[in-house]
Design a protein with these regions (language model features):
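Amphipathic alpha-helical repeat scaffolds of TPR domains
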Residues: 20-32, 56-78, 101-121, 147-161, ...
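A contiguous pocket-lining binding segment that forms or flanks enzyme active sites
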Residues: 125, 129-157
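Hydrophobic, well-structured mid-protein blocks that either form specific transmembrane helices
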Residues: 84-133
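Terminal, low-structured helical/coil segments at or just beyond the last alpha-helical repeat
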Residues: 170-174, 178-208
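Helix-turn-helix repeat elements of alpha-solenoid scaffolds
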Residues: 35-49, 81-93, 126-134, 173-178
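Canonical positions in the second alpha-helix
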Residues: 53, 96-97, 139-140, 179
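Bacterial Sec-dependent N-terminal signal peptides
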Residues: 1-26
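Structural marker of alpha-solenoid helical repeat scaffolds
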Residues: 56, 99-100, 143, 182
């Protein structure tokens, strides 16, 4: 009886290990594709792929996060004219991720989705989408005050805010510098996000 139980336990362990290996390989492959994706079609395909991985795994938030991130990159493209509809897709993926785990990375994407909506008409949307973007940053920083992507996004907001409203290059520069310092010292877990460092460095150069 004891040998039978040990054999069953061993089979379960081997099966779990194989499933974990397949998940890791699939994620690594598609994260690499996301890093090099340039078209809306590529990004849409990747968003769907990550969503399917998440649905298959059921307990992993990262696939849904990357689905939302792919949809977010679509939102920055000029061809994406309906920012509200795109943001709804982003937030649907984020809801799946946050049902498993709320963390700073999902709030970074939430910030970008709200920012894209706000930029449709900054003057009229600042009080709604602008506040949502700011709130997402604050929630993320409360969970992880050393997240470099959150400071990069905060610096971007300052950079694009007129000086008479508390923004400008002078205000953005030290926040970009903090972001870059945190990127340099970061030790992300396997499969965790690493994007943003080059963008932060490029923007800092514009603040000189």
């Amino acid at each position: 009886m004891q040998k039978t139980l040990l054999a069953i336990a061993l089979l379960i362990s081997v099966a779990a290990s194989a499933q974990s290996s397949r998940y890791t390989e699939a994620m690594q492959k598609n994260i690499s594709l996301l890093d090099s994706a340039k078209s809306v079609d590529q990004l849409l395909s990747l968003a769907s792929t990550f969503d399917r991985i998440g649905d298959a795994e059921k307990t992993q938030w990262l696939p849904y996060y990357y689905a939302a991130l792919a949809q977010t990159w679509i939102g920055w493209m000029p061809a994406t004219t309906d920012k509200d509809a795109n943001a709804a897709k982003i937030n649907a993926y984020l809801s799946k991720a946050e049902a498993i785990e709320k963390n700073a990375e999902t709030y970074a994407v939430e910030n970008m989705a709200a920012t894209q909506q706000m930029l449709v008409d900054p003057q009229s949307r600042w009080a709604t989408n602008g506040k949502d973007a700011s709130a997402a940053l604050q929630k993320g920083l409360a969970l992880d005050p050393n997240n470099p992507r959150l400071y990069y996004l905060q610096a971007m907001s300052l950079f694009n805010t007129p000086s008479q409203f508390g923004g400008g290059k002078d205000k953005a520069k030290p926040v970009f510098e903090k972001s870059i310092a945190l990127y340099k010292s970061a030790q992300p877990k396997p499969l965790y996000p690493t994007w943003g460092r080059k963008q932060a460095e490029d923007m800092l150069a514009q603040c000189q």
